[in-house]
């Protein structure tokens, strides 16, 4: 979501929960890659820009609670979990589904699961 993997040099990243750096129309789903002006100074309240095609607000292309995950990134993430040599779980509560099932998919495929978190999660029992 925050593009930290790309900034670190990763090249095969699947944004299962979307990205804050790509924009879409909240209604017609028109893409607005890198075309939305974002204020560079502190803003206390601002109206989102309107889609010129349907008038609905333009929003970050992220998955909000209750929305479906994007199909292609999800499918690629499942394949990666099935084929990985080791699966790292870092900084998550491991309770938001369906993404929380990925460590279990990796474990069932024979990969060791390593969890790095300040507290135990529902998936801690899978960890080596």
Located regions from the model:
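Conserved catalytic alpha/beta core of Sir2/sirtuin-type deacylases, generalized to analogous enzyme cores
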Residues: 1-127
């Amino acid at each position: 979501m925050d593009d930290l993997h790309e900034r670190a040099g990763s090249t095969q990243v699947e944004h299962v929960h979307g990205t804050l750096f790509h924009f879409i129309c909240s209604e017609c789903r028109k893409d607005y890659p890198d075309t939305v002006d974002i204020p560079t100074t502190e803003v206390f309240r601002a109206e989102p820009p309107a889609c010129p095609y349907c008038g609905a607000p333009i929003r970050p292309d992220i998955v909000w609670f209750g929305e479906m995950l994007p199909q292609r990134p999800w499918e690629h993430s499942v394949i990666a979990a099935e084929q990985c040599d080791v699966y790292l779980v870092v900084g998550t509560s491991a309770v938001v589904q369906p993404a929380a099932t990925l460590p279990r998919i990796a474990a069932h495929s024979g990969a060791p699961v390593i969890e790095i978190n300040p507290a135990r999660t529902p998936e801690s029992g899978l960890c080596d």
